[in-house]
Amino acid sequence: MSHQSELQLENKLIKQLIGLNYAAVQIQDGDALVSNLKSQLEVFNQITFTAKEFDAILNHLSKGNVFEKAKTLRDRFQLTKEDGTSFYVRFFNTEDTSQNLYQVTNQISLEGSYKNRYDVTLLVNGLPLVQIELKRSGLEIKEAFNQINRYQKHSFWSNDGLFQYVQLFV
């Protein structure tokens, strides 16, 4: 029986997710993650945000602990647009999940206290909600747990803390 490398396993997983209607997207770093979030939220909410408006959204998303962030996903954010009108930004459609935008990316590098690179990340409406840490055969599962703990400690808070929205580790 041959063993798959982590890269082979990663590519196979991504291919399966694409078959489940996830869009593959290349996100190299935190700046690209934020840029992708803006474009996905614009498509999802059917609106274009100015830089100032999107900064207000990022500020809102950066607040709270992990439990408050889970609540933020389900709530709407009242954004005061530059023209003075209000718009309610949605982050997740809980009533009809088929309306959400699903993406898969791999090898995102974030730099906090240390530089970390994440194996496979699932994004919903641009927010990273699932983190998958792959390990080749022969390594103990404990290695993946240790790695996720390092990520949480060293870089999940970087780039507006978007990785603090991760709801599930696999």
Predicted regions and their residues:
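An alpha-helical interface "stripe"
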Residues: 1-170
